[in-house]
Amino acid sequence: MIVTVTPNPSIDRTIEIDRLERGGLNRARRSTAEAAGKGVNVSCALALHGVATVAVLPLARDSASTYLRLLADAIPIAAVPIAGSIRTNVSVVEADGTLTKLNEPGPTLTSEDVDAILVAASGVPAASWVVGCGSLPPGAPVDFYARLAARASPGRRVAIDTSSEALGAAVCAGAALIKPNLDELETLVGRPLRTLGDAAAAARELIARGCRAVLVSLGPDGALFVDASAMSHAEARIDDVANTVGAGDALLAGFLAAGGDAGGLGDAVAWSIAAIRSPGTRMRAVTAADRAPVIVHERIDPARRLRS
């Protein structure tokens, strides 16, 4: 069982256009809306592939019915009722793949809401992983994910995918796994990371601060996994990119589904490929065609330039 925690869920609207004209009228070719949020996306990807999961999330009363209708029983949820409305995130996707995102802040959580979410997450039985994902809404303390990690009972590993101060706090709280992207990793260590060796050294630095393993999403350069005893890099060259929204969530879901260690890196990248070949936030099932281009390097090339 993998429990996800999404403190700031969203309704994700994806609008496809030919080309964005700032200040002009833009006509959509296609528009979709999905119940989302990073942890919800992870749970949906896991459930699609037969992995037991429960998504813990605050459910704002004013838009709860819309969110549940869009979710359509895709995953079991443990909802914490709160006041307000669920935020809407808009992704504008141009024909050449350019993505422009507009994200609302989300409803304000009270301290009681925060406590209720943490209690709900720790109350799901038989969980091997508890996965905290996404931005923090107004009212949530910066140590929200650190508190989530501190509450983990023996036998439950905690993975965190967030950014900024909240991610730094989770590192110091001893999370079993953190999943930054390259920009987030640079922010955590306070310097630019231009090569794969730079990224690996930064990951080692975070492990020295307290977390046990680091999974770095590198965009077109694939993904890097580092723990105290292993280091590996996986990549794939593909041309048919439909949408990069949700690719990092799929990467994390695939990694955890494959066991949450170095041996799962190839699967993680394959799941990410399936996501970027899928329109909208929700990924389709992984196929042999998604696995075929994945190359796993057990020994990394430290001189390799990133952002290729």
PLM regions and their residue ranges:
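Conserved phosphate/ATP/ADP-binding segment of small-molecule kinases
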Residues: 143-158, 162-229
